[in-house]
Amino acid sequence: MLPVPLIQLQCGVNSYEWGKKGNSSRAAQFAAASLDDNEFKIDEEKPYAELWMGTHPSNPSKDKHTGRTLLELIQDNQALLSPAIAERYQNKLPFLFKVLSIQKALSIQAHPNKKLAEKLHARDPKNYPDDNHKPEMAIAISDFEGLCGFRPLKEIAHFLDNVPALRQLVGEDKAKAFVETVKRNDGNESDEATAENKKVLQSAFGALMASSEADMTAAADKLVQSAKSAGADFTGTAVPSPGGAKLSELVGRLHGQFGADYGLFVLFFLNFVEMKAGEAIYLRADDIHAYISGDIIECMASSDNVVRAGFTPKFKDVDNLVNMLTYDFAPIEQQKMEPTDYTQDVKNKREAGATLNQTAIDSQSEIVEYNPPIEEFSVVRSLLKSQGSKVTFKPIDGPSIIICTQGQGKISVGPKVQEIKKGHVFFVGATAECVLESEDDKFETFKAFCVLDEQSNGN
Protein backbone atom coordinates (compact mmCIF):
# COMPACT_ATOMS: atom_id res chain seq x y z
CA MET A 1 0.00 0.00 0.00
CA LEU A 2 1.35 3.47 -0.97
CA PRO A 3 1.94 5.99 1.85
CA VAL A 4 -0.59 8.81 2.29
CA PRO A 5 0.47 11.60 -0.13
CA LEU A 6 0.92 14.34 2.51
CA ILE A 7 4.56 15.34 2.96
CA GLN A 8 5.84 18.11 5.24
CA LEU A 9 8.65 19.99 3.50
CA GLN A 10 11.83 21.71 4.59
CA CYS A 11 12.41 24.70 2.34
CA GLY A 12 15.58 26.70 1.82
CA VAL A 13 15.93 30.49 1.90
CA ASN A 14 18.20 32.60 -0.33
CA SER A 15 20.11 35.57 1.08
CA TYR A 16 20.28 38.10 -1.74
CA GLU A 17 21.19 41.68 -0.85
CA TRP A 18 17.74 43.03 -1.77
CA GLY A 19 16.05 40.94 0.94
CA LYS A 20 14.68 42.19 4.25
CA LYS A 21 17.02 41.78 7.20
CA GLY A 22 16.62 39.29 10.00
CA ASN A 23 13.22 38.65 11.50
CA SER A 24 11.57 41.44 9.48
CA SER A 25 11.74 39.06 6.50
CA ARG A 26 8.71 36.80 6.03
CA ALA A 27 10.95 34.50 3.98
CA ALA A 28 13.24 34.11 7.02
CA GLN A 29 10.33 33.66 9.45
CA PHE A 30 8.83 30.92 7.30
CA ALA A 31 12.21 29.21 6.75
CA ALA A 32 12.80 29.15 10.50
CA ALA A 33 9.45 27.39 10.99
CA SER A 34 10.20 24.94 8.16
CA LEU A 35 13.74 24.03 9.30
CA ASP A 36 15.05 22.70 12.62
CA ASP A 37 16.97 25.03 14.98
CA ASN A 38 20.24 23.22 14.34
CA GLU A 39 19.83 23.80 10.58
CA PHE A 40 18.76 27.44 10.49
CA LYS A 41 18.92 30.39 12.87
CA ILE A 42 17.92 33.89 11.78
CA ASP A 43 20.83 36.37 11.74
CA GLU A 44 19.41 39.85 12.37
CA GLU A 45 22.13 41.45 10.22
CA LYS A 46 21.60 39.21 7.20
CA PRO A 47 19.14 39.88 4.35
CA TYR A 48 16.72 37.03 3.58
CA ALA A 49 15.13 37.36 0.16
CA GLU A 50 13.39 34.21 -1.10
CA LEU A 51 11.93 31.02 0.34
CA TRP A 52 11.76 28.37 -2.41
CA MET A 53 9.16 25.59 -2.44
CA GLY A 54 9.54 22.99 -5.17
CA THR A 55 11.94 20.74 -7.04
CA HIS A 56 14.20 23.29 -8.77
CA PRO A 57 17.83 22.13 -8.33
CA SER A 58 19.04 25.59 -7.25
CA ASN A 59 17.24 25.23 -3.89
CA PRO A 60 15.28 21.95 -3.69
CA SER A 61 12.71 21.26 -0.98
CA LYS A 62 13.11 18.13 1.16
CA ASP A 63 10.87 15.75 3.06
CA LYS A 64 11.21 17.01 6.66
CA HIS A 65 11.13 13.48 8.07
CA THR A 66 13.41 11.55 5.68
CA GLY A 67 15.65 14.29 4.25
CA ARG A 68 15.01 13.07 0.69
CA THR A 69 14.38 15.75 -1.91
CA LEU A 70 10.87 16.26 -3.21
CA LEU A 71 12.25 15.61 -6.71
CA GLU A 72 13.50 12.16 -5.65
CA LEU A 73 10.12 11.32 -4.12
CA ILE A 74 8.27 12.44 -7.25
CA GLN A 75 10.58 10.54 -9.57
CA ASP A 76 10.17 7.39 -7.47
CA ASN A 77 6.37 7.69 -7.56
CA GLN A 78 4.88 9.40 -10.62
CA ALA A 79 1.40 9.06 -9.13
CA LEU A 80 2.27 12.01 -6.86
CA LEU A 81 2.18 14.26 -9.95
CA SER A 82 -0.38 12.21 -11.93
CA PRO A 83 0.76 10.18 -14.96
CA ALA A 84 -0.31 12.92 -17.40
CA ILE A 85 1.65 15.69 -15.62
CA ALA A 86 4.66 13.40 -15.09
CA GLU A 87 4.74 12.76 -18.83
CA ARG A 88 4.15 16.40 -19.83
CA TYR A 89 6.80 17.84 -17.48
CA GLN A 90 9.46 15.08 -17.49
CA ASN A 91 8.72 13.87 -13.95
CA LYS A 92 9.27 17.34 -12.46
CA LEU A 93 6.99 19.71 -10.60
CA PRO A 94 5.68 22.15 -13.26
CA PHE A 95 5.83 25.20 -10.98
CA LEU A 96 8.14 26.91 -8.52
CA PHE A 97 6.47 28.47 -5.47
CA LYS A 98 8.22 31.25 -3.51
CA VAL A 99 7.89 33.82 -0.75
CA LEU A 100 9.79 37.06 -1.49
CA SER A 101 10.68 39.68 1.14
CA ILE A 102 11.88 42.84 -0.59
CA GLN A 103 13.70 45.69 1.15
CA LYS A 104 15.62 47.00 -1.86
CA ALA A 105 14.48 47.03 -5.49
CA LEU A 106 15.08 43.95 -7.61
CA SER A 107 16.61 44.34 -11.05
CA ILE A 108 14.75 45.71 -14.07
CA GLN A 109 14.11 42.37 -15.72
CA ALA A 110 12.09 40.08 -17.93
CA HIS A 111 11.97 36.31 -18.28
CA PRO A 112 12.44 34.79 -21.74
CA ASN A 113 9.73 32.85 -23.55
CA LYS A 114 10.26 29.12 -24.20
CA LYS A 115 11.93 29.55 -27.59
CA LEU A 116 14.35 32.26 -26.42
CA ALA A 117 15.04 30.38 -23.16
CA GLU A 118 16.18 27.33 -25.13
CA LYS A 119 18.47 29.51 -27.27
CA LEU A 120 19.96 31.43 -24.30
CA HIS A 121 20.47 28.25 -22.26
CA ALA A 122 22.31 26.55 -25.13
CA ARG A 123 24.54 29.61 -25.64
CA ASP A 124 25.15 30.66 -22.02
CA PRO A 125 24.12 28.03 -19.43
CA LYS A 126 25.99 29.87 -16.64
CA ASN A 127 23.74 32.93 -16.81
CA TYR A 128 20.65 31.11 -18.17
CA PRO A 129 20.46 27.80 -16.25
CA ASP A 130 17.08 26.67 -17.65
CA ASP A 131 15.55 26.04 -21.06
CA ASN A 132 12.04 26.86 -19.85
CA HIS A 133 9.87 29.97 -19.98
CA LYS A 134 8.94 31.75 -16.76
CA PRO A 135 5.54 33.43 -16.65
CA GLU A 136 4.86 34.39 -13.03
CA MET A 137 2.23 35.68 -10.65
CA ALA A 138 2.76 37.80 -7.53
CA ILE A 139 0.24 37.96 -4.67
CA ALA A 140 0.87 40.57 -1.96
CA ILE A 141 0.96 39.43 1.67
CA SER A 142 1.99 42.91 2.89
CA ASP A 143 2.02 46.37 1.28
CA PHE A 144 3.87 46.02 -2.03
CA GLU A 145 5.37 48.38 -4.64
CA GLY A 146 6.58 47.44 -8.09
CA LEU A 147 7.07 48.40 -11.73
CA CYS A 148 5.13 46.24 -14.17
CA GLY A 149 4.81 46.53 -17.94
CA PHE A 150 4.98 49.61 -20.15
CA ARG A 151 2.72 52.53 -19.22
CA PRO A 152 0.08 53.91 -21.57
CA LEU A 153 2.08 55.80 -24.19
CA LYS A 154 0.51 59.20 -23.47
CA GLU A 155 2.00 58.99 -19.97
CA ILE A 156 5.49 58.27 -21.33
CA ALA A 157 5.06 61.17 -23.79
CA HIS A 158 4.14 63.43 -20.85
CA PHE A 159 7.36 62.50 -19.06
CA LEU A 160 9.48 63.00 -22.18
CA ASP A 161 7.98 66.50 -22.46
CA ASN A 162 8.35 67.35 -18.76
CA VAL A 163 11.49 65.58 -17.48
CA PRO A 164 14.48 67.20 -19.25
CA ALA A 165 17.00 64.63 -17.96
CA LEU A 166 14.90 61.80 -19.44
CA ARG A 167 14.54 63.54 -22.80
CA GLN A 168 18.28 64.27 -22.82
CA LEU A 169 19.15 60.59 -22.32
CA VAL A 170 16.65 59.24 -24.86
CA GLY A 171 17.87 61.86 -27.36
CA GLU A 172 15.97 64.73 -28.97
CA ASP A 173 15.24 62.96 -32.27
CA LYS A 174 13.91 59.75 -30.68
CA ALA A 175 11.92 61.66 -28.05
CA LYS A 176 10.35 63.95 -30.66
CA ALA A 177 9.46 61.02 -32.95
CA PHE A 178 7.88 59.20 -30.00
CA VAL A 179 5.74 62.14 -28.84
CA GLU A 180 4.59 63.03 -32.37
CA THR A 181 3.68 59.42 -33.23
CA VAL A 182 1.72 58.94 -30.01
CA LYS A 183 -0.21 62.19 -30.59
CA ARG A 184 -0.94 61.29 -34.21
CA ASN A 185 -2.20 57.82 -33.27
CA ASP A 186 -4.22 58.92 -30.23
CA GLY A 187 -7.55 57.06 -30.33
CA ASN A 188 -6.50 54.95 -33.33
CA GLU A 189 -6.62 51.28 -32.33
CA SER A 190 -5.87 49.83 -35.77
CA ASP A 191 -3.16 47.17 -36.12
CA GLU A 192 -1.07 49.62 -38.15
CA ALA A 193 -1.20 52.32 -35.46
CA THR A 194 -0.42 49.80 -32.70
CA ALA A 195 2.57 48.47 -34.66
CA GLU A 196 3.82 52.02 -35.24
CA ASN A 197 3.41 52.85 -31.55
CA LYS A 198 5.33 49.73 -30.51
CA LYS A 199 8.09 50.60 -32.96
CA VAL A 200 8.65 54.10 -31.51
CA LEU A 201 8.40 52.69 -27.96
CA GLN A 202 11.15 50.18 -28.72
CA SER A 203 13.20 52.91 -30.39
CA ALA A 204 12.94 55.30 -27.41
CA PHE A 205 13.47 52.59 -24.78
CA GLY A 206 16.35 51.11 -26.77
CA ALA A 207 18.00 54.54 -27.05
CA LEU A 208 17.74 55.00 -23.28
CA MET A 209 19.30 51.60 -22.58
CA ALA A 210 22.03 52.11 -25.23
CA SER A 211 23.16 55.48 -23.85
CA SER A 212 26.69 55.63 -22.47
CA GLU A 213 27.46 55.21 -18.78
CA ALA A 214 28.89 58.76 -18.70
CA ASP A 215 25.75 60.27 -20.27
CA MET A 216 23.52 58.28 -17.93
CA THR A 217 25.47 59.37 -14.84
CA ALA A 218 25.30 63.04 -15.85
CA ALA A 219 21.57 62.78 -16.57
CA ALA A 220 20.98 60.94 -13.27
CA ASP A 221 22.61 63.77 -11.30
CA LYS A 222 20.32 66.25 -13.05
CA LEU A 223 17.27 64.02 -12.47
CA VAL A 224 17.94 63.58 -8.75
CA GLN A 225 18.48 67.33 -8.23
CA SER A 226 15.27 68.10 -10.11
CA ALA A 227 13.29 65.54 -8.08
CA LYS A 228 14.67 66.91 -4.81
CA SER A 229 14.01 70.59 -5.56
CA ALA A 230 10.62 70.19 -7.31
CA GLY A 231 8.93 67.78 -4.86
CA ALA A 232 5.22 67.58 -5.69
CA ASP A 233 5.76 69.68 -8.84
CA PHE A 234 8.25 67.15 -10.24
CA THR A 235 7.30 66.10 -13.81
CA GLY A 236 4.94 69.05 -14.38
CA THR A 237 1.19 69.44 -14.02
CA ALA A 238 -1.45 66.74 -14.63
CA VAL A 239 1.15 64.14 -13.68
CA PRO A 240 0.37 60.51 -14.50
CA SER A 241 0.27 57.94 -11.70
CA PRO A 242 1.64 57.85 -9.04
CA GLY A 243 1.95 61.68 -9.00
CA GLY A 244 4.85 64.11 -8.72
CA ALA A 245 5.47 63.76 -4.98
CA LYS A 246 5.63 59.95 -5.14
CA LEU A 247 7.81 59.95 -8.27
CA SER A 248 10.16 62.42 -6.60
CA GLU A 249 10.36 60.19 -3.51
CA LEU A 250 10.94 57.07 -5.65
CA VAL A 251 13.76 58.68 -7.61
CA GLY A 252 15.43 59.71 -4.33
CA ARG A 253 14.94 56.32 -2.69
CA LEU A 254 16.15 54.28 -5.68
CA HIS A 255 19.13 56.60 -6.18
CA GLY A 256 19.96 56.05 -2.50
CA GLN A 257 19.92 52.28 -3.10
CA PHE A 258 21.79 52.11 -6.41
CA GLY A 259 23.35 55.51 -7.19
CA ALA A 260 23.28 56.56 -10.85
CA ASP A 261 21.47 53.76 -12.69
CA TYR A 262 19.50 53.25 -15.90
CA GLY A 263 16.61 52.06 -13.72
CA LEU A 264 16.01 55.65 -12.54
CA PHE A 265 14.89 56.44 -16.10
CA VAL A 266 13.13 53.14 -16.82
CA LEU A 267 10.83 54.21 -13.97
CA PHE A 268 9.17 56.69 -16.37
CA PHE A 269 8.45 54.02 -18.98
CA LEU A 270 6.83 51.45 -16.66
CA ASN A 271 3.60 51.31 -14.68
CA PHE A 272 4.04 51.88 -10.95
CA VAL A 273 1.84 49.54 -8.92
CA GLU A 274 0.93 49.44 -5.24
CA MET A 275 -0.86 46.40 -3.84
CA LYS A 276 -2.45 45.55 -0.51
CA ALA A 277 -2.46 42.01 0.90
CA GLY A 278 -4.51 39.70 -1.33
CA GLU A 279 -4.06 41.77 -4.52
CA ALA A 280 -2.18 40.14 -7.41
CA ILE A 281 -0.51 40.77 -10.76
CA TYR A 282 0.32 38.35 -13.57
CA LEU A 283 3.45 38.75 -15.69
CA ARG A 284 3.77 36.87 -18.96
CA ALA A 285 7.13 35.72 -20.31
CA ASP A 286 8.80 38.74 -22.01
CA ASP A 287 7.00 41.28 -19.73
CA ILE A 288 9.35 43.86 -18.20
CA HIS A 289 9.08 44.45 -14.44
CA ALA A 290 10.90 45.23 -11.19
CA TYR A 291 9.73 44.66 -7.63
CA ILE A 292 10.53 47.58 -5.31
CA SER A 293 9.36 46.68 -1.78
CA GLY A 294 7.07 44.40 0.23
CA ASP A 295 6.34 40.72 0.80
CA ILE A 296 4.73 38.53 -1.85
CA ILE A 297 3.78 34.98 -2.62
CA GLU A 298 5.15 34.26 -6.09
CA CYS A 299 4.39 31.34 -8.36
CA MET A 300 6.00 30.69 -11.74
CA ALA A 301 6.82 28.05 -14.28
CA SER A 302 9.84 26.15 -12.97
CA SER A 303 12.75 28.23 -14.25
CA ASP A 304 15.46 30.50 -12.84
CA ASN A 305 16.14 32.50 -16.01
CA VAL A 306 16.35 36.29 -15.66
CA VAL A 307 17.37 38.85 -18.30
CA ARG A 308 18.49 41.95 -16.33
CA ALA A 309 19.21 45.53 -17.35
CA GLY A 310 19.23 47.83 -14.30
CA PHE A 311 19.12 48.10 -10.47
CA THR A 312 21.56 45.19 -10.14
CA PRO A 313 25.24 44.39 -9.62
CA LYS A 314 24.60 41.04 -11.39
CA PHE A 315 25.12 40.10 -15.04
CA LYS A 316 23.25 42.50 -17.35
CA ASP A 317 22.10 41.55 -20.84
CA VAL A 318 20.72 44.82 -22.21
CA ASP A 319 20.66 43.84 -25.90
CA ASN A 320 18.64 40.69 -25.24
CA LEU A 321 16.25 42.56 -22.96
CA VAL A 322 15.58 45.33 -25.51
CA ASN A 323 15.07 42.80 -28.31
CA MET A 324 12.93 40.26 -26.44
CA LEU A 325 10.22 42.56 -25.02
CA THR A 326 6.73 42.53 -26.53
CA TYR A 327 6.36 46.33 -26.18
CA ASP A 328 2.74 45.86 -25.22
CA PHE A 329 1.51 48.88 -23.27
CA ALA A 330 -1.52 49.16 -21.01
CA PRO A 331 -2.70 50.61 -17.69
CA ILE A 332 -1.63 48.59 -14.65
CA GLU A 333 -5.26 47.59 -13.99
CA GLN A 334 -5.00 45.25 -16.99
CA GLN A 335 -2.16 43.32 -15.33
CA LYS A 336 -3.91 42.94 -11.98
CA MET A 337 -5.66 39.62 -11.39
CA GLU A 338 -9.15 39.37 -9.96
CA PRO A 339 -9.50 36.18 -7.91
CA THR A 340 -12.66 34.07 -8.14
CA ASP A 341 -14.55 32.23 -5.41
CA TYR A 342 -13.08 28.71 -5.36
CA THR A 343 -16.16 27.31 -3.63
CA GLN A 344 -18.35 28.23 -6.63
CA ASP A 345 -18.55 26.83 -10.17
CA VAL A 346 -16.95 29.01 -12.87
CA LYS A 347 -18.98 28.69 -16.05
CA ASN A 348 -17.18 26.76 -18.82
CA LYS A 349 -13.98 26.70 -16.76
CA ARG A 350 -14.20 24.53 -13.67
CA GLU A 351 -16.43 23.09 -11.00
CA ALA A 352 -16.18 24.36 -7.44
CA GLY A 353 -12.79 23.25 -6.11
CA ALA A 354 -13.55 23.36 -2.39
CA THR A 355 -16.33 23.24 0.20
CA LEU A 356 -16.65 25.03 3.55
CA ASN A 357 -18.24 23.75 6.74
CA GLN A 358 -21.01 25.81 8.37
CA THR A 359 -18.61 27.39 10.89
CA ALA A 360 -16.46 28.70 8.02
CA ILE A 361 -19.54 29.99 6.17
CA ASP A 362 -20.85 31.74 9.30
CA SER A 363 -17.49 33.48 9.88
CA GLN A 364 -17.36 34.61 6.22
CA SER A 365 -14.18 32.68 5.53
CA GLU A 366 -12.70 33.23 2.05
CA ILE A 367 -11.39 30.67 -0.44
CA VAL A 368 -10.35 32.36 -3.70
CA GLU A 369 -8.42 31.25 -6.78
CA TYR A 370 -5.90 33.24 -8.81
CA ASN A 371 -5.95 31.51 -12.18
CA PRO A 372 -3.54 32.86 -14.83
CA PRO A 373 -3.95 31.98 -18.53
CA ILE A 374 -1.35 29.18 -18.48
CA GLU A 375 -1.58 25.59 -17.30
CA GLU A 376 1.57 25.23 -15.15
CA PHE A 377 -0.02 26.70 -12.04
CA SER A 378 -2.93 28.31 -10.21
CA VAL A 379 -2.95 29.53 -6.61
CA VAL A 380 -5.74 29.36 -4.02
CA ARG A 381 -5.74 31.62 -0.95
CA SER A 382 -7.68 30.31 2.04
CA LEU A 383 -8.54 32.58 4.95
CA LEU A 384 -10.45 30.75 7.68
CA LYS A 385 -11.77 33.31 10.14
CA SER A 386 -12.76 31.32 13.23
CA GLN A 387 -11.70 28.29 15.24
CA GLY A 388 -13.34 25.15 13.89
CA SER A 389 -13.70 26.59 10.38
CA LYS A 390 -12.88 23.93 7.83
CA VAL A 391 -12.21 23.83 4.07
CA THR A 392 -12.17 20.60 2.09
CA PHE A 393 -10.26 20.71 -1.19
CA LYS A 394 -11.72 18.30 -3.70
CA PRO A 395 -9.29 15.83 -5.30
CA ILE A 396 -7.51 17.17 -8.39
CA ASP A 397 -5.45 15.25 -10.91
CA GLY A 398 -2.26 17.10 -10.10
CA PRO A 399 0.18 18.08 -7.31
CA SER A 400 -0.19 20.89 -4.74
CA ILE A 401 2.10 22.75 -2.34
CA ILE A 402 0.50 24.51 0.63
CA ILE A 403 2.15 27.14 2.86
CA CYS A 404 0.62 28.65 6.00
CA THR A 405 1.25 32.40 6.21
CA GLN A 406 -0.61 33.19 9.44
CA GLY A 407 -2.37 31.38 12.27
CA GLN A 408 -2.43 27.65 12.90
CA GLY A 409 -4.59 24.61 12.40
CA LYS A 410 -4.64 21.02 11.17
CA ILE A 411 -4.04 19.61 7.69
CA SER A 412 -5.27 16.14 6.82
CA VAL A 413 -5.21 13.75 3.88
CA GLY A 414 -7.06 10.51 4.52
CA PRO A 415 -6.13 9.18 7.98
CA LYS A 416 -3.01 11.36 8.24
CA VAL A 417 -3.47 14.53 10.33
CA GLN A 418 -0.68 17.03 11.04
CA GLU A 419 -0.27 20.38 12.74
CA ILE A 420 0.20 23.32 10.36
CA LYS A 421 1.23 26.78 11.52
CA LYS A 422 2.90 29.91 10.13
CA GLY A 423 5.79 28.89 7.88
CA HIS A 424 4.88 25.21 7.60
CA VAL A 425 4.88 23.86 4.05
CA PHE A 426 3.25 20.65 2.79
CA PHE A 427 3.19 18.77 -0.50
CA VAL A 428 -0.11 17.06 -1.39
CA GLY A 429 -0.07 14.38 -4.08
CA ALA A 430 -2.48 14.10 -7.00
CA THR A 431 -6.04 12.77 -6.46
CA ALA A 432 -5.89 13.35 -2.68
CA GLU A 433 -8.69 15.10 -0.84
CA CYS A 434 -7.12 17.63 1.54
CA VAL A 435 -8.79 19.24 4.57
CA LEU A 436 -7.64 22.34 6.47
CA GLU A 437 -9.16 23.12 9.88
CA SER A 438 -8.50 26.34 11.75
CA GLU A 439 -7.46 26.54 15.40
CA ASP A 440 -7.20 30.33 15.17
CA ASP A 441 -9.27 33.42 14.38
CA LYS A 442 -7.15 34.02 11.26
CA PHE A 443 -5.71 30.96 9.56
CA GLU A 444 -4.30 31.80 6.13
CA THR A 445 -2.77 29.44 3.59
CA PHE A 446 -1.74 29.61 -0.06
CA LYS A 447 -1.96 26.52 -2.24
CA ALA A 448 -0.16 26.30 -5.61
CA PHE A 449 -1.29 23.48 -7.87
CA CYS A 450 -1.28 22.21 -11.43
CA VAL A 451 -3.89 20.39 -13.46
CA LEU A 452 -3.84 20.07 -17.23
CA ASP A 453 -6.27 22.09 -19.31
CA GLU A 454 -8.13 19.05 -20.61
CA GLN A 455 -9.33 18.42 -17.05
CA SER A 456 -12.07 20.69 -15.80
CA ASN A 457 -11.77 19.94 -12.08
CA GLY A 458 -9.59 22.66 -10.60
CA ASN A 459 -8.39 24.92 -13.42
From Swiss-Prot:
Pathway: Nucleotide-sugar biosynthesis; GDP-alpha-D-mannose biosynthesis; alpha-D-mannose 1-phosphate from D-fructose 6-phosphate: step 1/2. Keywords: Cytoplasm, Isomerase, Metal-binding, Zinc. CDD domains: cupin_PMI_type_I_N. One of its GO terms (molecular function) is zinc ion binding. It comes from the Eukaryota. It is found in: Cytoplasm. One of its GO terms (biological process) is cell wall mannoprotein biosynthetic process. InterPro entries: Man6P_Isoase-1 (IPR001250), Mannose-6-P_Isomerase (IPR016305), Pmannose_isomerase-type1_CS (IPR018050), PMI_typeI_C (IPR046456), PMI_typeI_cat (IPR046457), PMI_typeI_hel (IPR046458), RmlC-like_jellyroll (IPR014710), RmlC_Cupin_sf (IPR011051). Signal peptide: none annotated. It catalyses: D-mannose 6-phosphate = D-fructose 6-phosphate. Belongs to the mannose-6-phosphate isomerase type 1 family. PANTHER family: MANNOSE-6-PHOSPHATE ISOMERASE (PTHR10309:SF0). NCBIfam families: manA (TIGR00218). This is Mannose-6-phosphate isomerase. It comes from Neurospora crassa (strain ATCC 24698 / 74-OR23-1A / CBS 708.71 / DSM 1257 / FGSC 987). The lineage of its organism: Eukaryota, Fungi, Dikarya, Ascomycota, Pezizomycotina.
